[in-house]
Amino acid sequence: MLGKVASRVSLRSRERKLRLFLDLLAPGPETTVIDVGVTDAPFGGGSTDNFFEALYPWPERLTAVGHTSLERFTAAFPQVTAVRADGRDLPFADGAFDLGFSNAVVEHVAGGREEQRRFVRELCRVAQRVFVTTPNRFFPIEVHTLVPIAHWLPRGARDRILRARGFDDVLEPLGPSELALLFPYSVRVVNRGMTLIAVGPL
C-alpha cells in the first residue's frame, strides 16, 4: 500500500518537473536535449524511472545517457538516442545540446561534493542551458525510503537504514546553497519543499 502511494506521489512530482521544464526552458520540436542519468528500468507498472523519455513531446530530439547497459531502455524508447557513458565524462562537444536535463541523479554521484561538481559542470559544458533536480536535504522525509530524518543522521546510521530498505546507492543530499555552488555560473534554485530545481545560466 505504502509503495503504491509513494509511486503515485513520485509520478505526480515528476509530471510537475516536466511541466516546469517546458515552461521555463520552452523547448520546441527542433530543440536538442540531453538527459543524463537514465536507467535500464522500464517506465510504468509502478516505476517512474525514465519518465522524461516517456512523457517528453519530442522524444526523437532526446539523447539519453546512462552508466549501465541500456538494452531495455533502447527497446522501450526507440526514438531516443541512448548512450552509455559516465556523466562526469560525456563524449560530446562543448555546447552540443540546446538543453540539459538531469533528475535526482547528482545526489547519487560518489566521491563527495567535488565529484558532484564535476558531474554538474560536465552537463553545463555540453548543454547551453540546464535543468537539474535533487531532493532537498532540509525536507524532513528522506524521499527514497520515506523514512523521516534518515538523511540527517550520521553516515553510518543513515547507510544502515538505506540498506535495510533495500537501497544501496550512494546518497549525498544537497541543500539549496550547496546545489547552487556546484555550477560554473549563476543559477536560479527553485525550492519546492521536497525537491530542489536548478535552472541556468541566468
Where do the language-model regions lie?
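Surface-exposed cleft-lining segments at the edges of enzyme active sites
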Residues: 3-8, 105-115, 166-170
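Short alpha-helix
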Residues: 161-186
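Conserved SAM-binding loop
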Residues: 31-139, 200
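Conserved class I S-adenosyl-L-methionine
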Residues: 129-156
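Class I SAM-dependent methyltransferase Rossmann-like catalytic core
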Residues: 1-28
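Soluble or luminal CAZymes and related metallo-dependent hydrolases
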Residues: 9-17, 115, 171-178
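Core SAM-dependent methyltransferase catalytic element
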Residues: 184-202
